[in-house]
């Protein structure tokens, strides 16, 4: 939904550009969950960025995500489940409230859809398996979250990275939000007349 990799890489390029050994990094060249390609940055630096208002102030939607989510909101409710810790989860919810939702009588909506945010504390849970998704579609870039989820339909999101290699081709891979829209339309067509999702 949002381009965290782009944001981290842009901030890294800003912060380290004056260093002698600096080489500008292209976000498309990030393939490691721990951002090992950012050779001058420590793991602590990356973690601090993920937990900083600066990161969320620079965070943008992925290409076409905002439009596709708006279109889907006419037919679907959203539960956004995200892993993190404090303050990361609080900042995520604040970003969503500012960029994704409208409030009507203290209930969050995007168009006519209900929007719910569920923060999963990474210190307490290693994945999202404790969240009941049995009546919905899980779109996730983490293979672990797909494997452990009870979601009715599962979409592996994003280009192949070291954290989402699906050697068994168990899941439909959507590399972008246009692909997601097409896959959801395909699911709706396959199950025409059935209540596929609540």
Segments the model singles out, each with a brief description of its role:
Residues 137-175:
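Acidic, Mg2+-coordinating phosphoryl-transfer loop and its flanking beta/alpha structural elements
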Residues 36-52, 76-78:
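Short, basic/glycine-rich phosphate-binding loops at helix/coil junctions
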Residues 1-5, 87-91, 126-127, 145-148, ...:
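Short catalytic/ligand-binding loop motif for oxyanion handling, primarily in non-cytosolic enzymes
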Residues 51-80, 86-90:
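Short, acidic loop-to-helix structural element flanking the phosphoryl-transfer center
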Residues 1-44:
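Active-site neighborhood of HAD-like aspartate-dependent phosphohydrolases
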Residues 107-149:
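Conserved Lys-Pro-Asp/Glu-containing loop-to-beta segment of HAD-superfamily phosphomonoesterases
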Residues 160-198:
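Charged phosphate-binding loop/patch that engages nucleotide di/tri-phosphates or the phosphate backbone
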């Amino acid at each position: 939904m949002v381009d965290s990799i782009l944001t981290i890489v842009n901030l890294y390029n800003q912060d380290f550009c004056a260093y002698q050994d600096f080489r500008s990094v292209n976000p498309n060249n990030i393939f490691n969950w721990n951002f090992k390609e950012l050779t001058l940055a420590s793991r602590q630096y990356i973690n601090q960025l993920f937990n900083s208002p600066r990161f969320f102030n620079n965070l943008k939607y992925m290409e076409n995500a905002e439009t596709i989510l708006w279109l889907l909101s006419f037919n679907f409710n959203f539960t956004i489940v995200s892993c993190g810790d404090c303050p990361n989860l609080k900042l995520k919810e604040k970003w969503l409230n500012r960029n994704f939702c409208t409030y009507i009588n203290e209930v969050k909506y995007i168009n006519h859809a209900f929007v719910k945010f569920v923060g999963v504390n990474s210190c307490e849970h290693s994945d999202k398996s404790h969240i009941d998704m049995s009546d919905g579609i899980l779109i996730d870039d983490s293979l672990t979250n797909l494997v452990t989820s009870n979601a009715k339909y599962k979409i592996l999101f994003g280009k192949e990275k070291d954290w989402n290699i699906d050697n068994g081709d168990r899941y439909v891979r959507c590399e972008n939000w246009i692909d997601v829209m097409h896959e959801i339309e395909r699911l709706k067509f396959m199950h025409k007349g059935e209540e596929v999702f609540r």
